Design a protein with these regions (language model features):
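Conserved AMP-binding loop of ANL adenylate-forming enzymes
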Residues: 1-30
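Active-site glycine/GP-rich loop and adjacent strand/helix microenvironment
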Residues: 19-191
């Protein structure tokens, strides 16, 4: 299935790259601006992807530019990760890409992975990935997938908010606050 990836895979020199073996169109998250939005749109439309993955801020910035140009894409599924997904970002991304977002959370150290439920009513732990504890809304995790150098009781500075009441005991995380950061917009309009 064709995929579009809008993450940090490409540097500032490369705008886009198509990899046949994985059927993936990589778009640079560093070069999203008024000069590249047309090429990004054409690349997406040419491949009719079934899914798009990316940083929420990158997807949102591309969605803003698509909105300015009056353009829509039709991509059934969107996967976000690595940053907080804010409600206003979700709304515009889903509108402009005509998609449904499924958010994911994980650490660079690969000690935990949490995924948004199919009903969009919270998050669940990916089975078999880690053993997790939630103390004062902080995540403490032990990896079950890293046999070379497992991290035991690894604590990140990310924050999750647990659900007070849940009908499905597997979906017990209300939202992920994570950490917040800033984006800087360059003179050329790139993020």
């Amino acid at each position: 299935q064709p995929l579009v990836s809008l993450r940090g895979n490409l540097g500032k020199k490369d705008t886009m790259m198509y990899v046949h073996i994985s059927n993936t169109l990589y778009l640079s998250s560093y070069n999203i601006n008024e000069q590249t939005v047309g090429a990004y749109y054409k690349g997406i439309e040419k491949r009719s992807p079934q899914a798009i993955e990316g940083y929420p801020s990158s997807l949102y910035n591309l969605a803003l530019l698509l909105k300015d140009k009056g353009l829509y894409c039709n991509i059934p599924v969107c996967f976000t990760s690595s940053e907080n997904l804010l409600d206003f970002q979700r709304q515009l991304i889903e509108e402009r890409f005509q998609t449904k977002i499924f958010d994911h959370y994980g650490t660079t150290e690969r000690t935990i992975r949490i995924s948004e439920s199919i009903k969009h009513d919270g998050y669940f732990e990916d089975p078999g990935y880690s053993i997790n504890e939630y103390l004062k809304d902080r995540v403490i995790s032990t990896s079950l997938i890293n046999s070379a150098f497992p991290l035991i009781r690894y604590q990140s500075s990310d924050v999750v908010i647990l659900k007070e009441n849940t009908k499905d005991e597997r979906v017990f995380i209300d939202r992920i606050q994570g950490r917040s950061g800033n984006c800087i917009k360059g003179k050329d309009g790139s993020i």
